[in-house]
A protein has these predicted regions:
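Helix-to-loop junction immediately C-terminal to a conserved catalytic motif
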Residues: 9
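Conserved ABC transporter NBD signature motif
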Residues: 17-25
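Conserved ABC ATPase "signature" region
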Residues: 24-25, 73-91
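Short coil-to-helix segment of the ABC ATPase nucleotide-binding domain corresponding to the Q-loop/switch region
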Residues: 55-63
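Conserved ABC ATPase signature
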Residues: 96-100, 104-105
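Conserved catalytic motifs of ABC-family nucleotide-binding domains
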Residues: 117
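Catalytic Walker B motif of ABC-type/P-loop ATPase nucleotide-binding domains
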Residues: 121-124
Length: 188
């Protein structure tokens, strides 16, 4: 799982085969170009949220834009748009992230992943630290994003979470399989 996420997130390059992101083999990029891709074309959502606890919601979402050439005024506009897309109450934008519930923190993390309008969103166990109702709310957020045309790779060990996906791929013994839980009848 970690190797797959590192490859998809352009943190590593394959030793065999090719990984095309937006039609280009990532092995053709220099390290500085890969860093730019990670900052602008990929969105990361983590199980543990990875928010700055004493920073406001808005500051946490703006953070990725600071590392790009995005003008200061546009940063806040884009952060507000990303937060609206995950249905977070505007009254929470000035709250510190450590004052939020788990579901609210995960929606802030998703908004942060969206703020650069990424080609690909990588979500590693995004419901793992949440209760069922809050997890369903996060999955509904991903469904809305998918319906809006976003590509999402969601890693999970939970079959009920995987059931929300349009396509399910299993990892078994280091190989990827589509369908049938990587067992009998699965296709590599």
């Amino acid at each position: 799982k970690s190797t797959l996420m590192n490859l998809l997130g352009c943190l590593d390059t394959p030793t065999r085969g090719r990984y095309l992101l937006e039609g280009v083999d990532v092995a053709d990029y220099r390290d500085d170009e890969l860093a730019e891709i990670r900052a602008t074309r990929l969105g990361f959502v983590f199980q543990s949220f990875n928010l700055l606890p004493r920073a406001t919601v808005l500051r946490n979402v703006v953070l990725p834009l600071i590392y790009t050439a995005c003008p200061r005024k546009e940063r806040e506009l884009r952060a507000h748009a990303a937060l609206r897309s995950v249905s977070l109450d505007e009254r929470l934008y000035d709250h510190r992230s450590n004052e939020l519930s788990g579901g609210q923190m995960q929606r802030v993390a998703i908004a942060r992943a969206l703020v650069n309008d990424p080609a690909l969103i990588l979500a590693d166990e995004p419901t793992g630290n949440l209760d069922t109702a809050t997890g369903d709310m996060v999955l509904n957020t991903f469904k809305r994003l998918r319906d809006a045309g976003k590509t999402i790779v969601l890693i999970t060990h939970e079959p009920d979470v995987a059931a929300h996906a349009d396509r399910v791929v299993h990892i078994r013994d280091g190989r990827l399989y589509e369908g049938a839980h990587g067992g009998e009848g699965a296709r590599p």
